[in-house]
Amino acid sequence: MQKQVKISGKSKENMSLLKHLKGDVQGKELVIEDSIVNERWKQVLKEKIDIEHDLFNYQKNREISKVPFLPVDRLITNDEVEDILNTLTEVLPTGKFTSGPYLEQFEKVLSTYLHKRYVIATSSGTDAIMIGLLALGLNPGDEVIMPANSFSATENAVLASGGVPIYVDINPQTFCIDPDKIEEAITPYTKFILPVHLYGKHSDMQHIRQIANRYKLKVIEDACQGIGLTDLGKYADITTLSFNPYKNFGVCGKAGAIATDNEELAKKCIQFSYHGFEVNVKNKKVINFGFNSKMDNLQAAIGLERMKYLSLNNFKRLFLADRYITQLAELQNKGYIELPELSEDHVWHLFPIKVRTEDRADIMTKLNEDFGVQTDVYYPILSHMQKTPLVQDKYAGLQLVHTEKAHSQVLHLPLYPSFTLEEQDRVMEGLFHVIKQEIGV
């Protein structure tokens, strides 16, 4: 019987698909899972496909003078724009911009994709984390163990909920929280573990779950950069997502979601997300307070259209990451840079490399000035190094050795679905030249 390569829109299967399309695996049949996230794939995928030509329209040696890091006018492809405009013509005449049928449909579709019983769509990923913590029973002063190298929204959600962030070190290879450091930080006040799937890399959730069970802690995962990860939500009490336009899957505004298999938790999340009201009862409060944090019906309608491209867009990210890793291997082998590992537990929200701390600023400047290539340090200030009164009072003297070293070395290269291979060639050409000729490592 011929073996199959299943296309599910998840990271593990995308890796198998990449190997199949590159010819690394022979004699397997492609099977496209019947899912909204694969809808665009069905239109472009064939048994034999030239990835560079069919997905990227690659024209080798086409001259490129400027490479933006993340251009806002290319967050949505032209095909998606057309689909979204068609949807808006259906929604706008109804006047149902906030509540409406698309919201419920969006939650059901996302629930099916995530293999979670309940999904509550929210107005942002930040609100999703905050509501999730409160639904799990966070009380003022409860400690939440988390990394310090995430976007400030993660810590802000904890602080706004009354929790106390406890920052621990990361695994420097993955940029994700180190489970061994979690155990060292547990105190009688610890109630939660909040791992972040930073840059799209899945944290070591199985290990984290084991620690949580041992100490009777709750796990709420920040998967705002991790939609499409295989086994997402498997080891967490609550999974939170962001649909900011800059994410792997976004709407045309701010939105997010909470996912769980626990009915009681889902009920509480719904209550907290809409003013504390009892579910399906008009304006009757059943908890002390709640927020105005439901996703808008209009954004849900847009989300349903954009979800059709999720599998394809995440595959493009994987292909681009693989291309970087393969073609920049020489620089890594000579010790000039450190590349991330290509793995089946990554959805490549960002592409981080490491360079020598003392060279980073020069590399970024020369790439931009000499090759027109924009790079970035996406989160320039670590949470425990902010200059706020709280940080200076509570975290003064805190040292996170691996977090701080990785942060001083990290440099993000452009990577997004509308990124062209010609642009990527320009990035790599510039990086080779600057590091080998200009920096003189």
From Swiss-Prot:
Substrate binds at T98, S99, F151, N244, P245, Y246, Y274, K282, Y379. CDD domains: AHBA_syn (cd00616). It catalyses: 3-dehydro-D-glucose 6-phosphate + L-glutamate = D-kanosamine 6-phosphate + 2-oxoglutarate. It holds the Pfam family DegT_DnrJ_EryC1. This is 3-oxo-glucose-6-phosphate:glutamate aminotransferase. SUPFAM superfamilies: PLP-dependent transferases. Keywords: Aminotransferase, Antibiotic biosynthesis, Pyridoxal phosphate, Transferase. Homodimer. The gene is ntdA. The keyword Nucleotidyltransferase does not apply. The production of neotrehalosadiamine is dormant in the wild-type strain. A mutation in the beta subunit of RNA polymerase activates the production of the neotrehalosadiamine. Its EC number is 2.6.1.104. Belongs to the DegT/DnrJ/EryC1 family. GO terms for biological process: antibiotic biosynthetic process; polysaccharide biosynthetic process. Pyridoxal 5'-phosphate binds at G125, T126, Q225, S242, N292.
